[in-house]
Amino acid sequence: MIIKKPKGTYDLLFDEISQWQELEKKVKFFFENYNYLEIRTPIIEYNEIFNRTATHSDMVNKEIYNFYDKKGRLIALRPEGTAGVVRSYIENKLDFNENLNKFYYLGSFFRYERPQKGRYRQFHQIGVEVLGDNTPFLDLEVIATVSEMLIFLGLKDFKIIINTLGDESSYKKYIKVFNDYIKKQDIFLCSLCKERLKKNSLRILDCKTCAQKNFLKSVPLITDYLNDFSKQRFDSVIKGLKFMKINFQICPHLVRGLDYYNHTVFEIILNSDSIGKRNSLGGGGCYDRLVEILGGHKTSGIGFALGTERLISVLKKYDLLEYSNNNQIDVYFLFLDSKLFFKSLFLVNQLRNAGIKTEINYRFLPFLKQLKKALKYNPKYFVILGEKEDKNNEISIKNTINQNQKKLSQLEMIKFLKKELDL
């Protein structure tokens, strides 16, 4: 019986891998120009990290993959990137310095969700975390970063939707008003939102079922309960977005799915329905309390994450993702006698070490059969070694496009091919 891949996962092969590599290359180039440094954290973390940072979220309560290791420690496959980056930031004592730390990451994440178009149980994200300062100008920098990155990749038909959750005192004031209002409307709540009312009531604003009901359209807005500091901070972000000519829209009902956000929160939305019913590429926001929650010194942060699968789907739709033909090689090496295999492999390795993409057949075959295999790789050149060439320390090189063929010494082989291939 054939063993198949687990539900909600997929394999990447051939041209698709090339497209992913092209995207990753562009993203790394872009982030490094913005002075972000790559960070890589384990795909496993202690489950406690996510319990501390997102206690009431669906991610922790329903979707997390976790298991006990052989010593009884509860381990989780990471469901998101921020908690692991912050854990690393604290563990490596970066919260003691006064530097601004700007990180980017690309990697795999895991959630036990119902698989559907654009949503998988193993998925990938491109993310940014900036730790070490609390200023609206940093919010603006991070939002501008994601906006400019998408433009750099060729996307234009998107906008940033933005809101503020205020500081801690503004949030507490609002959440009391919000809960009092919702409790009076609880007969209209769906079953999921009735559970949310007990734990993380603000997530009711994010419910697609309840969003269509009139009672939620009349809910009090957090922007009416901000203190002066929170209001001025958000006003500065909005003023900056206008000055930077970033396409945005204030959305007073926008909340994020994790508990640790405060102040600015945002999502990146496609204006056209490019990826099915879900038109969000990702989102992010500020977190002033997260470092402290995980045991570090009080440090502010802000970040965002984009779904890589969704991003690739959109880029492919608009033909914005270039890829090379992985099957095409520079040289296919043909040897005409089984006694010449060792010499042939020696020359092949010389070509490869010189940066020339080369393949050879590892079992001796008659010339026409070797040629048939070679043509599947669509090589730019054939390099041919026969008894006569070997005796004279020569090699035959044939251009597969114009069919020109010439003999030259084996010592000249690499120099000639590098010139011809413009390497």
Swiss-Prot record:
The UniProt entry, under CDD domains, shows: HisRS-like_core
Q: Can you tell me which residues the record assigns to a coiled coil?
A: none
- Cited PROSITE patterns: AA_TRNA_LIGASE_II
Q: Which GO terms describe its molecular function?
A: ATP binding; histidine-tRNA ligase activity
Q: Which PANTHER family does UniProt cross-reference here? A: HISTIDINE--TRNA LIGASE, MITOCHONDRIAL-RELATED (PTHR43707:SF1), HISTIDYL-TRNA SYNTHETASE (PTHR43707)
Which UniProt keywords are present, listed alphabetically? Aminoacyl-tRNA synthetase, ATP-binding, Cytoplasm, Ligase, Nucleotide-binding, Protein biosynthesis
Q: Does the keyword Signal apply?
A: no
GO aspect biological process, one term: histidyl-tRNA aminoacylation
Show the InterPro entries listed in the entry: aa-tRNA-synth_II, aa-tRNA-synth_II/BPL/LPL, Anticodon-bd, Anticodon-bd_dom_sf, His-tRNA-ligase, HisRS-like_core, HisRS/HisZ
Top-rank taxon: Bacteria
Subunit info here reads: Homodimer.
One CC-aspect GO term? cytoplasm
Protein's UniProt name: Histidine--tRNA ligase
- What is the protein's species of origin? Phytoplasma mali (strain AT)
Q: Which reaction does it catalyse?
A: tRNA(His) + L-histidine + ATP = L-histidyl-tRNA(His) + AMP + diphosphate + H(+)
Pfam families (UniProt xref): HGTP_anticodon (PF03129), tRNA-synt_His (PF13393)
| Known EC number | 6.1.1.21
Residues annotated as signal peptide: none
